Amino acid sequence: MTSKPTTQKSVMYRIPSERTLESLHEMIGSRMSKMSLKNTLRGISNPYERDENEGSEDMIFELFKIPNKNEASIGKLLTVLRQLGLRDDDPRLVPMMEKIKDFEKIAEEKCSEATEQKHWKLTKEQFKECIAPSIDIVSRALQTDMVIPNWVTFVDQIRTLFNECKEIREGQVATYIPQLARQSPNLWAVSLCTVDGQRASFGDVKHPFCVQSVSKAFNYAIVASDLGADVVHSYVGQEPSGRLFNEICLDSTNKPHNPMVNSGAIVITSLIKSKTNMADRFDFVLNQYRKIAGNEFIGFNNATFLSERATADRNYALSYFMKENRCFPKETESLTDALDFYFQLCSVEVTCESLAVMASTLANGGVCPITNETCVDPNPCRDVLSLMYSCGMYDASGQFSFNVGLPAKSGVSGAMIVVVPNVMGICLFSPPLDSLGNSCRGVAFCKKLVSTFNFHNYDCLVHNSNIKSDPRRRDIRERDRLIPVFHVARAGDLPTMRRLYMQGEDLNTSDHDDRTVLHIAATEGYETMIKFLVNVAKVDVDKKDRWGRTPLDEAKFFKHDHVSRFLEKAMKRPEQHRKDSVSSLDTDDEIDDDGFPEKPSFTID
């Protein structure tokens, strides 16, 4: 006796693309067939496709299972995750890594020797226990459900840009303080972090350097989150000044023009926890920096601080001018303390990698992508990106926004951050500066970046140039598409089904049980939808599911007589006439040219 098939649940149906299958199959390098891999990925992304007792952990185990053994290669999983952009020290993977090390320690004690990571093997229960705490990010990564789906290709393109810019020999290292003058002009680093925590680094990314004026962006974001934009902008404006970044001038309302010029940045720092003592204020900002950086390296260079303070005549002149015009909050009693705090924050040390995470937090609406912790409120995050776009590159801000079209902030140490909103943050570091105080290699890299990818703020993503590519884009033939065809068929939503057909969706697709949308429509008895699928979409009427049942069998089983008669006619057509429309059901309804009753015998809810 043939078992009764289960009815498709009302959920979105996700299928892996051929590109995803090929990419993962190559990475995993297993003996698993592409069809088995496809079914496994379906099971990971579509819970209703799995057996009741199977979880995502079981499906992932099957991906990395060693043939003929109840073991899987956890080392292979880690290798694949790295290729997809995730690092072993990613905070979201830390629970998994700790459990792996615990099991590996036990194994080493038994055999009295260390095992290379790539050879790590775990039993099914151990494997599942390891990945369970990090299952969300592991599942997303294996489905390439990330903002940059084809990570390996993207990283190769970035590496090419990095190497091209490495040959640039223009610019001079800043010399106004000894600590900057001693920097090697050959230092060159690029690090990026996406809003999903995918990361890549090139060059001297571990070399520490001071943030200098890059701190202005984060100081504004911190104080605006703490006090609110209205309070902050009662002291500082938002307009580009059109003047030198350290010029002694105010706007028409006697306020600094914006938080990115020196005068505005000094006032901004004076607003940070202005009622507390200096030590607590510094601790507060440093802790905020660490949160924004996902607890990656944040340090302090005291020598740079002392040198900045010793060469501060211009900033003192600015501060006294602002004090005369009552620009500071009333809590600011000592200009020396106010400037010391400003210089301290300019002397905070980072690496290219930690600053890239900070930039990606701004790209991610103020949420750190590797810890999922909200560090900056959404509106201040939006506002700081607007200010960086219009005022972030010293006296070249207008030129940079025109040519590159992305929010950015630079500093005289050679540091530079660039934000692609909702995509990634990039940190560039190269000490040689141009005549306007921006990193020569950094600016050149950004120009090459937007000439390669559709990242410029005003690049059209629809009618785009063939010269540029959009690494975010999932081509209709390649992307992992969320196809609601089974949901639509189950609901009898004919207008939506027609729209999906017009958009090029494959209405012949089948689920894990090889059931098609025609099977579902026949089960429900949706006459007009069946006629549309047969007469217009030309779906396969003979296709059998895993139980060997056709759509006609479904219609007969559920006693939908009119549908049965129509499908019988459709199946009796010779192969050469399969593209012809089948005559109407045996009803008195008038039929239009598309095979739809002009007055349907029932209403689709």
From Swiss-Prot:
ANK repeats (start-end): 480-509, 513-543
Keyword annotations from UniProtKB, A to Z: ANK repeat, Hydrolase, Repeat
Binding site for substrate: 213, 262, 308, 315, 342, 394, 412
EC number, UniProt record: 3.5.1.2
Skewed-composition ranges (Acidic residues): 586-595
GO cellular component: mitochondrion
Comp. bias regions, Basic and acidic residues: 569-581
InterPro entries cross-referenced by the UniProt entry: Ankyrin_rpt (IPR002110), Ankyrin_rpt-contain_sf (IPR036770), Beta-lactam/transpept-like (IPR012338), Glutaminase (IPR015868), Glutaminase_EF-hand (IPR041541)
Catalysed conversion reaction: L-glutamine + H2O = L-glutamate + NH4(+)
Molecular function GO labels: glutaminase activity
SUPFAM superfamilies listed in its UniProt record: Ankyrin repeat, beta-lactamase/transpeptidase-like
NCBIfam families named in the record: Gln_ase (TIGR03814)
Family: Belongs to the glutaminase family.
Protein name (database record): Putative glutaminase 2
Organism: Caenorhabditis elegans
Gene that this polypeptide is encoded by: glna-2
